[in-house]
């Protein structure tokens, strides 16, 4: 990267790579997979092949039946996502001891890059079009889990059992998670004869649904135009998704609901800019090249409007 027009700073790049916002779940839901070039190919498998049993009986002198596993070659490309943060030279010169304005700008800019990825991931995962025709349901009225008379447990478990590979993780919006944890029928399952009021631990809900993990989307987005008062909405809406995730899957091997192709590492650097304030300054840039993909729509089930907004 030393020949790049915008100089890459190893120290700032290390900050950008190491930065983690624990309240964002995109990397868990659609894990990052390295790709060799910006344009890459990935395979879409015919899932029926893995479940269609051929004749395996072989006669004493006959030839065994042959099987062939085929896949559809799909082409995609990573997209560059980056932001600049101008840092006035005056801020650098007057920074207190142990405070690095460029490092701080890198962290804040990285957070926005990750927030944008969170929004893209939620739009993909919480989208009915990302799921096979029979693997989605829109709830309304008394069917929504926010209605105490609803019965989410059999609905969810029946949906999980209907997927060709039973989902192993759940993805919930914050309101969906909270309402499920205090739903009287789920609380009753936890309390037994002690009543149906209270709130069950998330670990109990995970165990009850036989999932490896449940991820709750916490991120909020400001949808107000520049100059207007902030208007915050949840990146992960009042929905619920249950998907099969294989962390070992990549663009060529393994079967998983979705993944994120990543070309290279996240990068960061700074360059002098004489047009920042009176004394100029440094322009900090953070970016990454990624593409979020759903590779197996059959391996998930989506409840749209699982709870009232």
Curated annotation (Swiss-Prot):
Its main location: virion. It comes from the Viruses. It is found in: Virion. Residues 64-83 are annotated as: Disordered. Keywords: Capsid protein, Virion. Disulfide bonds: none annotated. GO terms for cellular component: viral capsid. Mutations in this protein confer resistance to host-encoded CBASS viral defense (in P.aeruginosa PAO1 transformed with a CBASS type II-A(GA) system). The above mutations are predicted to lie on protein-protein interfaces within or between monomers. Probably the major capsid protein. Multimerizes. This is Major capsid protein. It comes from Pseudomonas phage JBD67. The lineage of its organism: Viruses, Duplodnaviria, Heunggongvirae, Uroviricota, Caudoviricetes.
